[in-house]
């Protein structure tokens, strides 16, 4: 869990997960369209 220790990595992981969830649920216009 060393790579999740820094706040920047946490923000990156959260933003990436949000992008993936948005793409799956169709909330991101650029993901499905």
Swiss-Prot record:
Biological process (GO), any one: photosynthesis
Transmembrane stretches, start-end: 3-23
Cellular component terms per the entry's GO annotation: chloroplast thylakoid membrane; photosystem I
Highest taxon of the lineage: Eukaryota
Membrane topology: Multi-pass membrane protein
Disulfide bonds: none
Localization of this protein: Plastid, Chloroplast thylakoid membrane
Keywords assigned by UniProt, alphabetized: Chloroplast, Membrane, Photosynthesis, Photosystem I, Plastid, Thylakoid, Transmembrane, Transmembrane helix
Coarse class of the protein's main subcellular location: plastid
Membership in a protein family: Belongs to the PsaG/PsaK family.
Protein name: Photosystem I reaction center subunit psaK, chloroplastic
Organism: Cucumis sativus (Cucumber)
Gene designation: PSAK
């Amino acid at each position: 869990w060393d790579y999740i220790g820094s706040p920047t990595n946490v923000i990156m992981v959260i933003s990436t997960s949000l992008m993936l969830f948005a793409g799956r649920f169709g909330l991101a216009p650029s993901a499905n369209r």
